[in-house]
From Swiss-Prot:
This is Interleukin-2. It comes from Vulpes vulpes. GO terms for biological process: activated T cell proliferation; adaptive immune response; cell surface receptor signaling pathway via STAT; extrinsic apoptotic signaling pathway in absence of ligand; interleukin-2-mediated signaling pathway; leukocyte activation involved in immune response; negative regulation of B cell apoptotic process; negative regulation of inflammatory response. InterPro entries: 4_helix_cytokine-like_core, IL-2, IL-2_CS. Residues 1-20 form the signal peptide. Glycans are attached at T24, N112. Disulfide bonds join C79-C127. The keyword GTP-binding does not apply. PANTHER family: INTERLEUKIN-2 (PTHR48487:SF1).
Length: 155
């Protein structure tokens, strides 16, 4: 009788240990580098948008972006991935006039690759978006804050 309870207890303990096993250090290091790259790309885009020489900023601010209600986990990166196409279109407006945003397509492409590495190929996560939309600067700032938060937990 006690043997069955002991085996059940051991099985439960093994499941708990397996589910809470830490990521290997090389995997953590790679994730840190990918998060840092994503953070740098977002900051670069924000700097280009906020550049005082950007004649299209007022026009860019009229476009609205969706942000998740609460972005706290890697699965929320799916929400960013879903908005990247819209971001690329808006950032493409001033390309001919704004030196700081000339490599938009390459940056967005790099971000897509980085996001795929970070979140994996799993796309079944459905984003719950905030009721209010965000301007391009609010959108970028929110994702920068998210990346900084995740990055700080990794280091």
């Amino acid at each position: 009788m006690y043997k069955m309870q002991l085996l059940s207890c051991i099985a439960l303990m093994l499941v708990l240990v397996a589910n809470s096993a830490p990521i290997t250090s090389s995997s953590t290091k790679e994730t840190e580098q990918q998060m840092e790259q994503l953070l740098l790309d977002l900051q670069l885009l924000l700097n280009g948008v906020n550049n005082y020489e950007n004649p299209q900023l007022s026009r860019m601010l009229t476009f609205k972006f969706y942000t998740p209600k609460k972005a706290t986990e890697f699965t929320h990166l799916q929400c960013l991935a879903e908005e990247l196409k819209n971001l690329e279109e808006v950032l493409g407006l001033p390309q001919s006039k704004n030196v700081h945003l000339t490599d938009t397509k390459e940056l967005i492409s790099n971000m897509n690759v980085t996001l795929l590495k970070l979140k994996g190929s799993e796309t079944s996560y459905n984003c719950e978006y905030d009721d209010e939309t965000a301007t391009i600067t609010e959108f970028l700032n929110k994702w920068i804050t998210f990346c900084q938060s995740i990055f700080s937990t990794l280091t």
